[in-house]
């Protein structure tokens, strides 16, 4: 190690954040050439990163940024292997640089991000260098970057635990209502963060998905009814359908006639049918759209007023503000959603590292 000064080792460490012994070894390997030592460590770091890449990164953060004029917003999920690293200052700096790069280069996908420049090198190279320094696999898993056209705003909400983030876009016509629309979007984003709707509208469901979910829903209600019957409690109605997308005009017309026939058989005067049938139809629709109420943003009951669905809240605001509001964008990221984290004991971990 002769000829390798402590000052040179320190300089290399400052440039790379690598360990002291790694810096010494790198300088010895390249005969004291600083640039070659940096390259040596980078290559070594990338090699380490590749070995770490088969370990699932299921911790991390969901971060978002909304433009001051509410005309654009971005949200990103960045995964690490442990919660400890997610709180590391180096990891926080990585999150900041990721958002800055997305904004600077108008990025919409992780593929675009990895190829985009950051400090005169591809972002992917920067990411790998951080994996080597931090010592864990890090993955930029998901990105959404929304832009609002005229008469639209975008607002969002990030939970304080940095594990859930939501963006909501709303179209409006009356410019004077913009501040109220901004606030409404944030409140709806907070609702979505808590209630986890899967999609904006039932139109986003496939018919196969709805039919499958409806069968499961019916089985669930039948089981609940068995217990309710045993306890002498009222039974729930068994639905025929699960979503509004199944309630065609023909289905609704058929049901309306069935209610009218029922009233006729009961001897109810026809002149009062119009006062009874709408309520029955409303109940029929409610009983046969339970999937929408559980899984769609517009169909869920608002956490701040559980007598109204989100769709009804938006409609009421439109009427009150003399406007025509419509939710046009809905993005929700939850940390690690869909990832199954491996359970490994310490002995297995050591054995894996020795391979």
Swiss-Prot record:
Its main location: cytoplasm. Pfam families: EF_TS (PF00889). It comes from the Bacteria. One of its GO terms (molecular function) is translation elongation factor activity. Gene3D superfamilies: 1.10.286.20, DNA helicase RuvA subunit, C-terminal domain, Elongation factor Ts, dimerisation domain. InterPro entries: EF-Ts_dimer_sf, Transl_elong_EFTs/EF1B, Transl_elong_EFTs/EF1B_dimer, Transl_elong_Ts_CS, UBA-like_sf. Residues 82-85 are annotated as: Involved in Mg(2+) ion dislocation from EF-Tu. It is found in: Cytoplasm. Keywords: Cytoplasm, Elongation factor, Protein biosynthesis. GO terms for biological process: translational elongation. The keyword Cytoplasm applies. One of its GO terms (cellular component) is cytoplasm. Belongs to the EF-Ts family. This is Elongation factor Ts. It comes from Helicobacter pylori (strain ATCC 700392 / 26695).
